[in-house]
Amino acid sequence: MRLDALEAMRLTRSNKQDKRFPNEEDVRYQDGLLFPSIRPRFTLQAPAKVFTIGSCFARNIELTLQDYDIELPTMGFSVPETEWDFRPNGLLNEYNPGTTSQRVLSALGAREETNETLFETGEGFLDLLLPGGYPVTRERAEERRREIDAVYGELASSDLVIITLGLVEAWYDEQDGTYLNRMPKPPAFRKDPDRYSFRRLDVADALPMLDRAMEALIEAGVEHVLLTVSPVPLGTTFTGGDVIVANSYSKSVLRVCAQTLAEKHPQVDYFPSFEIVGSGGTEAFNEDNIHVRHKIVERVTGHMLKAYFPDIRPKTEGEFRTVQDDVGAEESAARA
């Protein structure tokens, strides 16, 4: 952004409430959290179809949205515990900009998915495009991919697509030119040491991939995209530094990407879930300091709904359902 001096002064004068950081007397401070003012680029009415893409925080948002008159295609996918121990649709998690973009482009027919990312072990096949899970037969791995494709068949017809950006540390298949959602098993490195590489993405890497995904969504007819940055931290870093610092870098890159995309595309807006949760410090997280407390998720999602679905009401009054966290969360993208 670049403004001439008079325009900058005009904007500052008109931004009376929000231009200064809030103290505890400010209406944006509520019970230990800071809730930025939202000026939504668009609003929607229920019933609506909302498609959620991204890290485990996207799954948390889904569980809160279930209590409203909102259709959630991703909640229709599940796998048995023999394939995945945690949330039934947790295998839909996408962590890095590469896999997120690949998934969107594949769903919209702009990219072909390769079966070479099914890695054979002594116990079966692992799908490196998924964030985890146990080995299955090749037939089941291919069947599961078709099931996921069917879910993503609802993408273009959704009223709102919410994309939660997770991290920028990624594994890459040099042979296929494909970003992976999990680290290949060490035997794969020994078998073909030049095939896989670790990449820490910067803005120059991540932004073009995400921009292609935004353009594909818009071209397919999606009118509303809401970008967020997951407040769930990176669990493990492969950069050789402290994960606390690596996480800050990761979120900073994604935050810049989200802002840039929202400023470029009229159909895209940014929602500050990352800023809200971060304002609460470690008190906003469970004891692992990774997963966000569900009551905090409810408050964040409520703030989002108030802005983008101003007339929406819960289906029934009462307590929200209990959440089962995806153990490992952002970490699962980095380790086997």
Annotate each language-model stretch with its function.
Residues M1-A336:
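Extracellular glycan-modifying ectodomains
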